[in-house]
């Protein structure tokens, strides 16, 4: 069973990780087509972001030899492509934070209180300055990870740093934008509230922030820190 599969019922072919034996060294992958005997979908799950996720169930599904994509030991090779996927997640999270920031900027320039525009209040000016610092710093980390990956030098550590920075910046700036805009930002007539909901999901999807912090720490100390139970 696989619980969370984004828009799972819309796909016709599924890449499925399988175990050929115990341990990560025996993980590979196969291709399973929609409609195969024993392969069914569970009830759709609605998430905060508005997306639909579907559980997948595999009950003695037969996989022919020509549908085996990677045999035992192929998991590590396939995970190498995850750096690129995480960069995409990172860029989308940052883009949503930037959209919310820009919407709040326009609101602060046009919305007036006590006889002047919101942007003229020093307290709000500092909020916008902090938001820009977060977004611009995260963007540079994203560019570093993407540029090196495009040059054939992907770095899991650089990608992890960029994802954590962009996920945080995107969510925090969307949250701050709603606070600045008040009801106008909280309303579903505005896309800013969607930015908040969506960026919250990116902090989990594609590698939870806590998992990536472990990866960053391994780079700091140049050591592997197994998080599972100790081997006897």
Map each language-model feature to its residues.
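Short, charged, solvent-exposed linker or helix-capping segments at domain edges/interfaces
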Residues: 28-29, 40-43, 64-72, 230
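Alpha-helical interface subdomain recognition
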Residues: 57-60, 72, 80-232
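Active-site PLP-lysine loop of aminotransferase-like
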Residues: 2, 47-48, 86, 163
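Flexible, small-/acidic-enriched active-site or ligand-binding loops
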Residues: 34-62
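Active-site beta-strand/loop segments that form the cofactor-binding cradle
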Residues: 1-10, 20, 44, 61, ...
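Exposed loop/turn and edge beta-strand positions of beta-sandwich/beta-sheet ligand-binding modules
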Residues: 12, 52, 160
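A short core secondary-structure module
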Residues: 1-40
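Basic, amphipathic alpha-helical recognition segments used for DNA target recognition
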Residues: 32-36, 67, 98
């Amino acid at each position: 069973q696989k619980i969370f599969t984004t828009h799972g019922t819309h796909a016709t072919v599924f890449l499925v990780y399988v175990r050929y034996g115990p341990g990560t060294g025996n993980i590979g992958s196969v291709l399973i087509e929609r409609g195969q005997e024993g392969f069914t979908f569970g009830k759709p799950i609605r998430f905060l972001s508005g997306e639909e996720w579907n559980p997948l169930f595999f009950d003695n599904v037969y996989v022919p030899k020509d549908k085996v994509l990677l045999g035992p030991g192929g998991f590590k090779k396939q995970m190498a492509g995850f750096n690129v996927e995480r960069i995409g997640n990172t860029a989308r999270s940052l883009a949503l934070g930037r959209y919310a920031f820009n919407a709040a900027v326009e609101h602060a320039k046009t919305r007036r209180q006590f006889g002047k525009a919101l942007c003229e209040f020093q307290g709000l000016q500092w909020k916008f300055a902090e938001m820009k610092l977060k977004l611009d710093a995260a963007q540079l980390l994203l560019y570093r990870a993407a540029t090196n990956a495009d040059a054939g030098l992907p770095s899991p550590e650089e990608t992890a740093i960029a994802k954590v920075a962009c996920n945080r910046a995107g969510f925090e700036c969307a949250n701050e934008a709603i606070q600045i805009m008040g009801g106008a930002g909280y309303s579903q007539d505005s896309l800013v509230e969607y930015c908040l909901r969506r960026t919250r999901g990116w902090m989990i999807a594609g590698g939870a922030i806590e998992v990536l912090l472990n990866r960053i720490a391994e780079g700091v100390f140049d050591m592997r820190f197994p998080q599972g139970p100790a081997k006897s």
